Amino acid sequence: MNPESTPSSSQTAATETAATQTAAETQGLHADEEFAGTVADAIGEGLAPALITVTGPDRPGVTAAFFRMLSSYSVQLLDVEQSIFRGNLSLAALAGVEKENLDSMRDGLQATLSSYGMGVQVQVDRDLESTRPRSTHVMVVIGRPVTAVHISQIGQTLADYGANIDSIHGIADYPVTGLELELTVPDASPGGGVPLRKALAELTSDIGVDIAIERAGLSRRAKRLICFDVDSTLIQHEVIEMLAAYAGREDEVAAVTERAMRGELDFAESLHERVKALAGLDASVVDKVARDIKLTPGARTTIRTLKRLGYKAGVVSGGFIQVIEPLARELELDFARANTLEIVDGKLTGRVIGPVIDRKAKAESLKEFAWSNGIQLHQTVAVGDGANDIDMLSTAGLGIAFNAKPALQEVADASVNHPLLDQVLFLLGISRHEIEDADLRDGTYRRVPLRG
């Protein structure tokens, strides 16, 4: 299949099926909300609805003692949650308790757990909801650092738009601080919450942390393919500028590149103009540049982690395949597509061979790679930095702008502005703890001291 090919009827049907399933999931959400009831509706007759909360220092045996005491009063459990944060335990149970046993159960819990230094609260309320609120969205906040002021401002913005924070937990302490917030947004319909998204985008630029928000649910965990731009995304350089340096025309080429990435010039025309500057260079220069490439910090970790999870990973670049192929082999990527420099008699001619990999071709390449691997577009992720990546990010299920030009940030689903590629993992809900556990098991774990 070439970049201009279109999906088959079976592929189109699969896409329609996915859309139907997504609609059904949305309808199911509303149906669940309609049938949500109180604890009093869910427990047997003669039982009082109670929310039992225990807090204090975490010690071995606390949980066992808690449930042993509840079991002696034949308590009916509806929901339980326990968490430990820096040595402090919080344990809560939503339960049905025989009315005549409420006082003795409370006294028994306090007597038993006071020896562990735990406090006990029992709230009896027939109007307690029997089911947890179902979060509609997930927000990831990334910064270096993230401060209380940042979270206060984010929380106030959410409150101003009627959104509620259901939970917060840390997902990263290196190389950035990352927090994941589960939210309930009033308008949870597809396409809803647009004013909130705009307000958060403005807040991001004002306070200097990255904020990404997407719908909660299975689709967030269903991603199976990731496609990276190369120059200034997967690697730290613009390859054509590295080549131009050997021709003594780096500044001239860099100026054209900058205008093209901002969307001020047609990419294909600008590419031809820049490649002309390379005419006459010895082909060995291409190999030298390939050896000099430096990956963006976090690139190896990101690709290694996603490959462990079964992702297909690859690159689509407006750069040159002769430089990218060695990198793709080293990183064990599943696909790579880029322009081909014409070389005649060991010299660059100043031309490229075949169709230019431009904005449209990048998006078509993503589609082709997805279809060839049996992966639907809503299961894809694309990461890029320039106007040339707009169509690719718009096509992907999740488009991530990485230290990007404004034109790309405006259309991306999420934007990150720290030069560390493993932020992509945090946006996908993968925690630093999970990454490093896997690295420890296979001997690849390392933390490089951060500067600045």
Please name every model-derived segment.
Residues 222-268:
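Active-site neighborhood of HAD-like aspartate-dependent phosphohydrolases
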Residues 62-63, 150-152, 234-237, 389-392:
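Short glycine/serine/threonine-rich phosphate/pyrophosphate-binding segments
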Residues 280-398, 402-452:
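C-terminal cap/substrate-recognition subdomain and adjoining C-terminal extension
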Residues 2-13, 20-223:
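A conserved regulatory-domain signal marking ACT and ACT-like small-molecule sensing domains
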Residues 57, 61, 100, 104, ...:
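Conserved active-site and cofactor/substrate-binding residues in soluble primary-metabolism enzymes
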Residues 124-130, 211, 215-224, 257-283, ...:
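Long, charged amphipathic helices and adjacent flexible linkers at domain junctions
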